[in-house]
A protein has these predicted regions:
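Active-site helix/loop of acyl-thioester processing domains in fatty-acid/polyketide metabolism
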Residues: 61-86
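Small-residue-enriched segments and motifs
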Residues: 29-32, 92-95, 114-116, 142
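Beta-strand-rich interaction surfaces with strong enrichment in secreted/lumenal proteins
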Residues: 19, 33, 57, 101-104
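HotDog/MaoC-like acyl-thioester-processing domains
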Residues: 2-8, 75, 107-113, 117-159
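Hydrophobic beta-strand-centered segment that forms part of the acyl-chain substrate-binding groove
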Residues: 11-12, 77-113
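Extreme N-terminal tail/first-helix region
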Residues: 1-22
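Catalytic strand-loop segment that frames the active site of acyl-thioester-processing enzymes
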Residues: 25-61
Length: 159
């Protein structure tokens, strides 16, 4: 059971190639490092680069912040599948976004920290609360529901 797992250290997580955990690949990767993972919380760090596809006029857009949150969720799912269940990366879908509030947007070369706290997981669905910080400054908060593509009993891929 995942909740009884001994979770990895920050040093181990920082050494992971984030590309192993995500279905997205460059130039669409919006997180740099996975820095904390346990049965409830996932934390990723990201440096905003000027070549990021969601940067406009030197600032990461709101859409970029949302994609960063979604990919933090994906990194959690990817770690669990790759390291615990020895499965390939699974495709996830945003099922719902609620109460997305933007307080500020980060600039290029700034580091943001995204924290996702799982509130409930059932039948391949994860309900979580997320926040994005730059240092001690809150940039965004939201509630997000993620669905993971599952195989059915006949082995046919379905959503």
């Amino acid at each position: 059971m995942v909740s009884e797992t001994i979770w990895p250290t920050e040093a181990f997580l920082r050494e992971i190639d984030i590309h192993k955990l995500l279905p997205q690949q460059e130039p669409f990767v919006m997180i740099s490092k996975l820095v904390l993972l346990n049965n409830v919380r996932t934390v990723c760090e990201t440096i905003i680069h000027s070549d990021n596809i969601f940067v406009e006029d030197g600032t990461l857009t709101a859409l970029g912040l949302m994609e960063n949150i979604a990919q933090t969720c994906a990194a959690r799912i990817g770690f669990i599948n790759y390291y615990l269940f020895k499965k390939e990366v699974q495709i996830g879908y945003i099922g719902a976004i609620r109460n997305f509030e933007i307080i500020g947007l980060p600039k290029i070369n700034e580091k943001i920290t995204t924290t996702v706290d799982v509130k409930e997981e059932v039948f391949g669905m994860t309900l979580a609360e997320a926040k994005v910080m730059k240092d001690a400054n809150l940039l965004a908060t939201t509630e997000i529901k993620i669905a993971v593509k599952q195989d059915n009993v006949y082995g046919i891929k379905s959503v």
